[in-house]
């Protein structure tokens, strides 16, 4: 159960302060950072165990005089489990490294870690259950508990539906503020008089500092000139093609983030489906960055698992690359309009059902259970 506690004129002895006065929110957010990483570590461990157990099963379980692992659709799930497992570990290593280093402003990074781990971890365990078939449901075969427990991870430590708009909003805050500042300085405001608009816009049109920011943005938004892709460097030459692909993905994501802001204007604040796509794209890009960094380090140190992990890395890279392209493509081609209509229709129908026959939250302001 949860409850609200209100403090009125409470005096706290100085020796009881947990941190510094006025810095309590920082303490709370720091706890969230650690909680999201420890949760993700547990998810990674469960996913690894599920992959090992289910693969052992299909290696030794025969159908049609062949082990199940020889069938391509089963192999697809095996490959996906181990590839995504590598991605999970890579992201976790990177972000927990930031924590150990003492980085302070990593709320977006830990939120990304939580969202990615809870979603991908669930997919791994679900694949494991699928290839074990009905045996996966049996308590003695271990996966039943892993599968059941994995579902809660997308809800706790900040549900993914809350984290996605947060990643979008906080992660894109600087760019959004820059775009809004330019718009306010140089766009016509219908609430102002003609003279007020002219007085504001004309000086800004010859302001060198403002023009330096506005011209590249305008050419990108209205003329389609996309800025150069950022440089992604690696120590080992075999990774250069992957670094280039990652660079192109970053370029595409950054461009479409700006374009989405142009397409939806002020409504982007309430278009959570759009926000979620951009958030997921950023999440997968960050995971790819962690993977490239990790495999680069493994190559340089000739890690004992390098040969195996290179195979997992390459498959995970392609899987996440495809997911990024899909998320960005759906910014323009999607079912959002019909979704909103269907949801409204369903809500209207649901309102016709008697409240007395359903469980309703005890604090509901609109109905009693």
Task: Write out the residue ranges for each language-model feature.
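Flavin-dependent oxidoreductase catalytic core characteristic
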Residues: 1-75, 79-369
